[in-house]
Amino acid sequence: MPVYNKEELVRFVEEAKQYARYGKVADYIPALGKANPNELSIAVYTADGKVVDAGDVTVKVTLQSISKILALALVLIDRGEDEVFRKVGMEPTGDPFNSIAKLEEVQPSKPLNPMINAGALAVTHMIRGRSVEERLERLLAFIRRLAGNEQITYSEEVAQSEFETAFLNRSLCYFLKQHGIIDEDVEELMDLYTKQCAVEMTCIDLARIGLVFALDGRDPHSGELLMPLDVARICKTFMVTCGMYNASGEFAIKIGIPAKSGVSGGILAAVPGRCGIGIFGPALDDKGNSLTGVKLLERLSKTYSLSIF
């Protein structure tokens, strides 16, 4: 296993920061529009339990679409593959993450995968519990175990900001309800989903969760199985095929690491058997991925031969 060097990581961060001027923050969500586009930080959590970081890793980042992979893991544990994949498919779309197009073209009208918004809404709908509060608490408890951090919660400001502006996601919910994919109150589902997306943590937390996936679901310190091997495998597969929105193919070729991004600028990556990586860089490219974060991962992948292909 390569020895990750802090001085080298700091240099890579400074190099990648030069690209921030070509990106822009997600200002269509007012609370995310306040982010500093020049911010960039990274944590690498290795299989032997060591952490190397660069940049301000104390800054908290909301998960946004990164939460989709965590909700999927919980729902797969709760309900099993057969039930989950009756409601949502397994295929990449090549469409933007918030597109409704394939829902209208494909029969039956179930979302093509859990990483696009329609599929993620169907997955969140399947989180067990009798109320929004109970379901959110179950998801938070699961995320806290993966991150080894009992303090993790969600940003009320970001959740409220997203709830007030989630017009397209509401449209997706009503479409899914019309076709029998979901059967709950749309506003309750939106309440849960926006709070799920607003769960916030540091790059170190992200990296530790990435390492759990990299270790096939095992806690890096205790060795306890936090999720079944098959669940970790399915999630990593989706990270490769759909994790970077409609740039997933290019990302697989250039970088080759299972990863999931969010429009907050966060990236969670899992290098099987080797390390987890957490990145925060809010300057986004036109696909909604962290522009500086992707540049940083590309440099890491090439320097340390991290591609799984």
From Swiss-Prot:
The keyword DNA-binding does not apply. InterPro entries: Beta-lactam/transpept-like, Glutaminase. Keywords: Hydrolase. Gene3D superfamilies: DD-peptidase/beta-lactamase superfamily. It is an enzyme of class 3 (hydrolase). It holds the Pfam family Glutaminase. The keyword Hydrolase applies. Disulfide bonds: none annotated. It catalyses: L-glutamine + H2O = L-glutamate + NH4(+). Substrate binds at S65, N117, E162, N169, Y193, Y245, V263. One of its GO terms (biological process) is glutamate biosynthetic process. SUPFAM superfamilies: beta-lactamase/transpeptidase-like (SSF56601). Coiled coil: none annotated. GO terms for molecular function: glutaminase activity. Its EC number is 3.5.1.2. It comes from the Bacteria. Homotetramer. Belongs to the glutaminase family. This is Glutaminase. It comes from Geobacillus thermodenitrificans (strain NG80-2). The gene is glsA.
